[in-house]
């Protein structure tokens, strides 16, 4: 007889707080761009935020009492595997910093959307239906990749089909027809999410790989 989980237990099992934060970054990126903020204004904020995030991890690795407090407060926003490892938010910040610093702004924003939404979708779909489909990489299922693909198509439609629709947008200037661009974006999101680059954190790999591929095709 199965025991019914409490909301707290169910939320922890499915990483609801972490996924909610992860997903919200995509909406926040759209909000910032919609309000007229640009990479040059956002990069210093990321650099400032990186300092306490990195320092906090260094302290908790060397001070058990602080580590217990840190995990009690920040723990719900972390994977279980991060409790004794570097916090994923550090890699998130590095990945976003790189794409904002190196790539055109629209490509940077799209790569953040793919990180924020495709990664969460792949994780959610993979946990639910991954056991019914083949594994395509370590901890990656075909079901999760299909979820990431659909979400990548959705990201492209929302961003370049609804949000950035002017004649000066990269999508409008691209020689690739928009429906094909949506499909390609889906493949890029799925590929980047499933990719294992020297064991690096997905939060770093997904935006950088996505931005590189988008830059090449656009």
Swiss-Prot record:
Positions on the Lumenal side per record topology: 1-19, 60-88, 164-179, 218
UniProt keyword Repeat present: no
Molecular function GO labels: ATP-dependent diacylglycerol kinase activity; CTP-dependent diacylglycerol kinase activity; lipid kinase activity
Cellular localisation: Endoplasmic reticulum membrane; Nucleus membrane
Transmembrane segments: 20-37, 39-59, 89-109, 143-163, 180-200, 201-217
UniProt cross-references to InterPro entries, sorted A to Z: Dgk1-like
Cofactor: Ca(2+); Mg(2+)
Cytoplasmic side: 38, 110-142
Top-rank lineage group of the source organism: Eukaryota
Biological-process GO terms, alphabetical: mitotic nuclear membrane biogenesis; phosphatidic acid biosynthetic process; vesicle-mediated transport
Enzymatic class: transferase
Topological relation to the membrane, as annotated: Multi-pass membrane protein
Keyword Membrane: yes
GO cellular component labels: endoplasmic reticulum; endoplasmic reticulum membrane; nuclear membrane; perinuclear endoplasmic reticulum
Swiss-Prot/TrEMBL catalytic activity: a 1,2-diacyl-sn-glycerol + CTP = a 1,2-diacyl-sn-glycero-3-phosphate + CDP + H(+)
EC number: 2.7.1.174
Keywords: Calcium, Endoplasmic reticulum, ER-Golgi transport, Kinase, Magnesium, Membrane, Nucleus, Transferase, Transmembrane, Transmembrane helix, Transport
Protein family (similarity comment): Belongs to the DGK1 family.
Role, per record: CTP-dependent diacylglycerol kinase that catalyzes the phosphorylation of diacylglycerol (DAG) to phosphatidate (PA). Controls phosphatidate levels at the nuclear envelope. Counteracts the activity of PA phosphatase ned1. May be involved in vesicle trafficking between the endoplasmic reticulum and the Golgi apparatus. Involved in pre-tRNA splicing.
Name by which UniProt lists this protein: CTP-dependent diacylglycerol kinase 1
């Amino acid at each position: 007889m199965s025991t019914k989980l409490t909301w707290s237990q169910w939320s922890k099992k499915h990483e609801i707080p972490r996924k909610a934060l992860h997903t919200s970054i995509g909406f926040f990126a759209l909000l910032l761009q919609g309000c007229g903020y640009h990479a040059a204004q956002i990069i210093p904020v990321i650099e400032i935020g990186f300092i306490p995030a990195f320092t906090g991890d260094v302290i908790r690795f060397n001070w058990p009492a602080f580590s217990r407090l840190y995990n009690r407060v920040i723990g719900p926003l972390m994977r279980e595997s991060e409790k004794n490892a570097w916090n994923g938010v550090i890699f998130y910040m590095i990945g976003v910093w790189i794409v904002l610093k190196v790539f055109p702004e629209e490509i940077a924003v799209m790569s953040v959307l793919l990180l924020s939404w495709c990664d969460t979708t792949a994780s959610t779909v993979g946990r639910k239906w991954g056991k019914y489909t083949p594994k395509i990489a370590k901890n990656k299922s075909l079901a999760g990749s299909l979820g990431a693909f659909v979400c990548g198509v959705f990201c492209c439609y929302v961003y370049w089909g609804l949000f950035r629709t002017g004649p000066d947008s990269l999508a409008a200037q691209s020689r690739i027809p928009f429906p094909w661009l949506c499909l390609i974006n889906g493949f890029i999101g799925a590929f980047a999410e499933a990719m294992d680059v020297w064991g690096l954190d997905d939060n770093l790999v997904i935006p950088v790989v996505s931005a590189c591929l988008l830059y090449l095709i656009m």
